[in-house]
Each structure stands twice: as C-alpha cells, then as structure tokens.
Swiss-Prot record:
Gene: hcp
HAMAP family hit by this protein: Hydroxylam_reduct
Species this protein is from: Fusobacterium nucleatum subsp. nucleatum (strain ATCC 25586 / DSM 15643 / BCRC 10681 / CIP 101130 / JCM 8532 / KCTC 2640 / LMG 13131 / VPI 4355)
Designated name of the protein: Hydroxylamine reductase
Main subcellular location of this protein, as a coarse class: cytoplasm
Compartments reported by the entry: Cytoplasm
C-alpha cells in the first residue's frame, strides 16, 4: 500500500493524488496524522451533536468543543500545519474531550453516538508511538476507507468545504462572533461523511447544504470584521519598502494584525502585509496606524524569495506556509499562531485572556535590517460590497450607458503552476468595457497590471480575502434587483475562478447554493471529483474547466460590445 493518500489541493500529484509525499511538502507521517486528527474530531462530534440536540453540557460545548471542531479542521487545510507534535497534541486533546463527553452521556446517548461506528468513539491510545502507528491505517482513518469512488468523492467534497468553512468560522470566533447553528451543521456534515446509510443523492444534497452554510459563515465573518475594524474603504497601498526595520504578517487573521499594530506603535518599526493580508489596509481601524507601511512581495507560493529579501521577522497567522529550504536565511525569524505551525518555528505567546503577546517579534524586528525594495508603486484595495454598493448609482449608470458591458469574477487562489499565467493573459485581453471583480490571492496574477478604469471606476475591484467572495454574491443580488431580473444568471457576470485549496472549495459550494451556474474552475478541475460526480456538477450547474485565453474569451462572450443587452 502507498504511504499516504491525499488529493485535496489543486497541485496534487498527477492530478490524482499524492502517495509518498505531498506536493505541498507534507510528509506521509504528517498526512497520516492529519487524517487521524479528522477521525478523532468525528468521534468528538458523535457525542457533541447528541448533547447539542438535547441541550446538554452547554458550558463544555461553548468552552471547549466549538473551538476544537473548527481548529482541528483548519489545521488540516493545505499548507497550514506541518508540525507533527502540534498535530499529535491536538489529537490527544480531542481524545480527552471525547472521553469527557462520554463520561456525561447516558446509555441511550452512548448508543446514539455509536451509530457512526463503535470504533470511532471508543478507540484510544496515549503514546505518540501508538498514535503514529494507528495513523498509518489508511483503511480506517484515511480517505481510502471509503471504497466506492463516487461516495468517496462526495464525502471529500463535503470535508473540503467544511475545512474552508472552519477557517472562516475561526476568524469570526477570534473576533467574538459565533453561531450555534454553524457549529451544529459542522457536526452534522462531519458525521454525514461517516454515515453509510446516506446514498449519493443524499450526499449531493448535503454538499449543497454545505454551500448554504458557507454563505452563512462568510456573512458572519463579514459582520465580525466590519463590526470590529470598520467597513473597508478604497485605499491605495504602497508596494515598495521603507527605511526602517519591519515585521511581515501573512495569513488571514485580521484580529492578529490589529493586535500587532497596537503593540508595535511607537517602537520605531513598520508593519507590512503579505499575500492575503493585503486587504487589511482598507479597514479604518487598521489603516489609522501611521507605521502600517504597505504590502510586501507577491502571492504565498513565492514566499521563499520574499522572506529572504524582507530581512525582518515574519508571522504566519494561518496558511499558506511553503516549507523553507535547508539553508533558508529566514527560518529563525518566523513565528506562527492559531492553526498554523512548522517544526522549529516559534509560537506567538497567548495570554490568559486570549490576546496575543507580540513582544518577542517586535524586539527581534528592532535589530533587523530594513526590507530590500524589490518593487515600487501602489495598488488599490477596499472594494468590498458596502463600498461597491455605495457606488451603485455610478455603476448602474455606466452599465446603462454601455460604458460597462461585463463583469468577470476572478476570485480564488494563486499557485505555482505555470498554467496559472493564463489568468494574467486573460485579464490583459479582456475588452476595455469589462471590469474584474476579485478576492483572494488570485489577484496577484493581475493586480499590478495597468488596466486603467472606466469613467473613474478601476477595472480591477478587489473585495479582499478569499472569504470576501461573499461581497460579489451580495453585489450580484443587488444588481439583479436593480435591473428587475428573475435569475441571477441573467446578469452580465462571468465566473472564472482559480482554485488551490479548501477555502476555494467552500466559495464554490456557496456560489452553487446561491444558484449561480456556468462557473469555470481552473487551472485544472479537482482531482477529488470522480467522473460521475463531475458529470453531476456539469449537468446540473454547468461547471466547466478552462481551455485557452482566446477560446475562453469567445466562450464567455467577452468581446467588445457584449453585455446585458446582447
């Protein structure tokens, strides 16, 4: 048998699955432990769902279980955590939590929990050696435990959607926003992937329901971000480098960024964002800090070069981590927090009240050299739904006059594959009466191009992070209302989405739930879609891949003059 099996990301080996080491860099041991962590979590969920329905052990659910459910999923997202010891600790914490729940269960509740498998809720090992050995049993804890290819495909599609949802839920959680409804659904979906009584049709329904809850969790995170940090504003962001030492913060957790800015003010250093942290510059409660200098570098996959040039400490608040080469000059100045982790990298200290202590990072930054300037100029951010809707009259006026003919949603992820240059060429060759709506790190393929504007409206509108794809759904629904259309698919909006990891999966499922059809996904279709499941998505939702820029522009009707009236 192969050492591992993982096919959750776009770059999976040969488009079918990694079997000896992950293309992402994770070892077979790490892959097995991540599988075991999810198996452990499902055992916790088997009990917590019973208690939640019965209104029992509320304090335990709110105090420990809810956070565990989302954090365990988040740890297993592509490029989030490579630290086997951290994953082992999370497995042990889950076993302890499961046993704590079990001790409170009646015989009837135990029987209900065991319907997903007696082994799921009763297995137990204490030593790392035993846990590692058990994690190697792919037929029990791994993806391949499901023999039927189509059932496996649907179960994993749900799991990957859940992982993306959990990431967004954790960010909202960190900002004090939670939802009992969302936690209950996470349990339902986790256990749905263990329920052998569910047929393919029922799993398809659960997949779309996952998309429904994806919309809910993105709305929750949007509320969390804006209530704590203000509504994003159109903001120009410097992409050069200053003369002072700096700290580079990567990932997605805006609350960590807020705390870092507050703790580092008046310290003589600057704060820079990296990759998906770029949208932070649009939030009033973040941009008010004078030492919030700009954005440094490009998308996550190019970080080895960017981190070397930056010279100062780097903080990963979440994924995406690229394992450093052995002689990397920056590996002793990288810190992690939340679900992110890498062997040998330092952890950010967490205070008793849950706040972070960034003092060690700040002190290190003071003795580092300033970043090397590798580019200069500015890029514009801050076009989330509130900002775009405030311009609604201007947008509608330009649509009615014919100045704007089409919108192209190019949200999603960036990645290493050379095929992704397609998105740069696609953006460059769009008609001048077309506006790109983007979010996520896919933007790095074209956000530094000079694509101009249409009567003062930039031709690239950046809503923010991957979760801010929610903004384009809000905008689309508003435009549908303004133009009196019966179907959202009648709008002059094309969806050409780039995916890489599981947050893009929940965005896709959310769009499907909202009824959006004919979405194109690239640079390749997911390897975890079996032929039959892919056929269902094609026939029911019009899902398709990409071809060449020239062919796709024709296919999408993206030529001068095409639009709402054509």
């Amino acid at each position: 048998m192969d050492k591992m099996f993982c096919y959750q990301c776009q770059e999976t080996a040969k488009g079918t699955g990694c079997t000896s080491i992950g293309v992402c860099g994770k070892t077979s041991e790490t892959s097995g432990l991540q599988d075991l962590l999810l198996y452990t979590e499902k055992g916790v969920a088997a009990y917590s769902t019973v208690f939640r329905k019965n209104g029992k052990a509320k304090e335990l659910l709110e105090g420990k279980v809810n956070r565990y459910l989302i954090n365990s999923l988040f740890i297993t997202i592509t490029n989030a955590n490579f630290d086997d010891n951290a994953i082992l600790d999370e497995i042990k914490a889950g076993l302890k939590l499961r046993e704590e729940l079990k001790a409170l269960a009646t015989d009837e509740e135990k029987k209900e929990a065991e319907k997903y498998g007696a082994d799921l809720v009763n297995w137990y090992y204490e030593s790392n050696e035993d846990l590692i050995k058990f994690s190697e049993n792919q037929s029990v804890v791994g993806v391949l435990r499901t023999e039927n290819e189509d059932v496996r495909s649907l179960r994993e599609l749900i799991m990957y959607g859940l992982k993306g949802m959990a990431a967004y839920a954790e960010h909202a959680f960190n900002l004090g926003k939670t939802s009992e409804e969302i936690f209950a659904f996470v349990e339902e979906a986790l256990l749905g992937t263990m329920d052998d009584s569910l047929n393919a049709e029922q799993l398809v329904a659960l997949t779309i329901k996952t998309g429904e809850y994806g919309v809910k969790v993105m709305a929750l995170l949007d509320e969390a971000n804006t209530s704590a940090l203000g509504t994003p504003e159109i903001t120009k962001v410097k992409i050069g480098a200053g003369k002072r030492p700096g700290i580079l913060i990567s990932g997605h957790d805006l609350w960590d960024l807020k705390q870092l800015l507050e703790q580092s003010k008046d310290s003589g250093i600057d704060i820079y964002t990296h990759s998906e942290m770029l949208p932070g510059h649009g939030y009033p409660e973040l941009k008010k800090y004078s030492h919030f200098y700009g954005n440094y570098g490009n998308a996550w996959w190019d970080q080895r070069k960017d981190f070397t040039n930056f010279n100062g400490p780097i903080i990963f608040t979440t994924n995406c981590i690229v394992p450093p080469v052995k002689n990397a000059t920056y590996k002793d100045r990288v810190f992690t927090t939340n679900a992110a982790g890498y062997p040998g990298w330092k952890r950010i200290k967490v205070n008793a009240d849950g706040t972070k202590d960034f003092s060690e990072v700040i002190e290190l930054a003071k003795i580092c050299q300033a970043p090397v300037e590798v580019e200069s100029g500015e890029i514009t951010v801050g076009f989330a739904h509130n900002q775009v809707l405030s311009l609604a009259d201007k947008v509608v006026e330009n649509i009615k006059s014919g100045a704007i003919k089409r919108f192209v949603v190019m949200s999603g992820c960036d990645g290493r594959m050379s095929q992704r240059h397609y998105y740069t060429e696609f953006a460059e060759n769009l008609p001048k009466d077309t506006i790109i709506l983007t979010s996520g790190c896919a933007k790095y393929k074209y956000n530094k191009l000079n694509l101009g504007d249409i009567n003062g409206i930039p031709r690239v509108l950046d809503a923010g992070q991957c979760n801010d794809s929610y903004s384009w759904a809000v905008v689309a629904l508003k435009l549908k209302e303004v133009f009196g259309l019966n179907d959202i698919n009648e709008l002059p909006i094309v969806f050409n989405i780039a995916w890489y990891e599981q947050k893009a999966v929940i965005v896709l499922l959310a769009l499907l739930y909202l009824g959006i059809k004919n979405i194109h996904v690239g640079p390749t279709l997911p390897g975890f879609l079996s032929p039959n499941v892919a056929k269902v998505l094609v026939e029911n939702f019009g899902i398709a891949g990409i071809t060449t820029v020239e062919e796709d522009l024709k296919k999408f009707g993206l030529y001068e003059g095409s639009g709402l009236d054509n």
